[in-house]
Amino acid sequence: MNANDATLTGLATAHTGSTAGHPAPNAPAASSFDLILQAAAGSALGNSGTPYTLTISAIDLTCVTQGWPTLTLHQSFDAASGWKPSGTGQGYQCTQTFPVPVPGGGPGGPLAGHTLQCVASLISRGAWIVSIIHTNPFVLV
């Protein structure tokens, strides 16, 4: 990876507290699930403090509508935002877990049986760095 670049490398839905992706993240009867985001940054960027905006949204593919309100986070390439040196020493990595409440409070809610997909984007000021990623489609119960 270029020393001055960053990319979103993974986005998955999982049961709360799990690190393994799951196509029905609130099954069999949970009121929330986790969205796990992974990213990588080059050696010059990863601890530079450069600001960026991380936006996460959900799309209800069944009804072709917004699944729930968009999450917009103003973060920086620094330890406070979760960036740390990668195991290989060639750059930085970041893994963030976002708890997602199931709309309607849990199983049987208004999106039960719907297929959804989450999309995340990382955009630096001036759009020098832009990365977009999406989850596999998933179903809420």
For every predicted segment, state its role.
Residues F33-Q38, P51-D60, Y92-V139:
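Internal, hydrophobic beta-strand segments that form the core of beta-sheet-rich folds
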Residues M1-T13, H74-A80, L116-C118, L122-V141:
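Short beta-strand elements
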